[in-house]
């Protein structure tokens, strides 16, 4: 059986996943995922992040294992290239520049735009056909193609609604989330301290701005999808060979000073004692590192 990827507290801490937003910008609905605060910045409870990431990765794995389609969505600058890279790595779909209203709920219109893109592609690749156009007309077609590619490159082969939506930054991608909710498409999403987790089926508390954090999430998502694909292919009698293992990250630990501890909440039941100890120790180690650096 394929091994679903996992992550530990140290990996999350090293990637800066625990850093939320300023306390003044928080969404009270995220209270249950917040461990405390430091210098007016909320600190995310990584014990819950570990547990909920595991649940989300299993959802991704099971979706692909059952031949489902996953749509990755994040149009923010720091996530755009990373989302495309890892979605392509695991053979899934993505939107990484601009979410066009109706991408899910008005698929007929989007399909028409994809058809237009494919026709432009076909024309521009046909040297004989291009002889019938002026240079200006060819330039106009190239510009139209490039504009369409920005929005549609990652979904041009998506023939129906996805079976799972994976989102980084629920605030920025609220239109995509609303459309998924209308169509009953389950949602995996990284939820920062200023996010609303209400419509998210598989929330992952974490920093949604740090490039290192985003790369870690996407690497895990892609690995889970690849493991699901491996199982799907095995069930079909196809030997895919060795799958690429999760790449170890050589990340530098972030320093965390003494925390002003908030009231403890937990939406993830039965966080084991080992995880509690690991989290407390990781924070203490980071604290000691900072103190020694300042000595």
From Swiss-Prot:
Q: Which UniProt keywords apply?
A: Ribonucleoprotein, Ribosomal protein
Does this UniProt record's set of keywords contain Ribonucleoprotein? yes
Query: Region Disordered: what ranges?
Result: 263-295
Name the SUPFAM superfamilies for this protein.
Ribosomal protein S2
Please provide the Gene Ontology terms (biological process) for this protein: translation
Query: Keyword Ribosomal protein, does the record have it?
Result: yes
Q: Per UniProt, what is one GO molecular function of this protein?
A: structural constituent of ribosome
Mention any one GO cellular component term assigned to this protein in its UniProt record. Answer: cytosolic small ribosomal subunit
Q: Which family does it belong to?
A: Belongs to the universal ribosomal protein uS2 family.
Protein name listed in UniProt = Small ribosomal subunit protein uS2
Q: Which organism is it from?
A: Rickettsia massiliae (strain Mtu5)
């Amino acid at each position: 059986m394929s091994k679903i990827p996992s992550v530990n507290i140290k990996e999350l801490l090293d990637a800066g996943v625990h850093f939320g937003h300023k306390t003044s910008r928080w969404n009270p609905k995220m209270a249950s995922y917040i461990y405390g605060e430091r210098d007016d910045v909320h600190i995310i409870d990584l014990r819950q992040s570990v547990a909920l990431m595991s649940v989300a990765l299993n959802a991704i794995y099971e979706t692909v294992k059952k031949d489902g389609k996953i749509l990755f969505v994040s149009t923010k600058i720091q996530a755009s290239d990373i989302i495309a890279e890892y979605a392509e790595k695991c053979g899934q779909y993505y939107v990484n520049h601009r979410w066009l209203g109706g991408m899910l709920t008005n698929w007929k219109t989007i399909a028409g735009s994809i058809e237009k893109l494919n026709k432009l592609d076909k024309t521009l690749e046909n040297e004989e056909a291009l002889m019938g156009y002026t240079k200006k007309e060819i330039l106009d077609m190239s510009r139209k193609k490039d504009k369409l590619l920005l929005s549609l490159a990652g979904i041009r082969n998506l023939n129906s609604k996805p079976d799972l939506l994976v989102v980084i930054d629920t605030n920025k991608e609220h239109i995509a989330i609303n459309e998924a909710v209308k169509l009953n498409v389950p949602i995996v999403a990284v939820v920062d301290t200023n996010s609303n987790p209400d419509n998210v089926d598989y929330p992952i508390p974490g920093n949604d701005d740090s490039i290192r954090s985003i790369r870690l999430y996407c690497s895990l998502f892609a690995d889970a999808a690849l493991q699901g694909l491996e199982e799907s292919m095995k069930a079909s009698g196809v030997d895919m060979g060795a799958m690429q293992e999760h790449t170890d990250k050589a990340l530098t630990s972030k320093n965390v000073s003494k925390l002003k501890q908030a009231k403890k909440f937990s939406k993830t039941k039965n966080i084991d004692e080992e995880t509690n100890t690991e989290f407390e120790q990781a924070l203490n180690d980071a604290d000691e590192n900072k103190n020694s650096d300042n000595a």
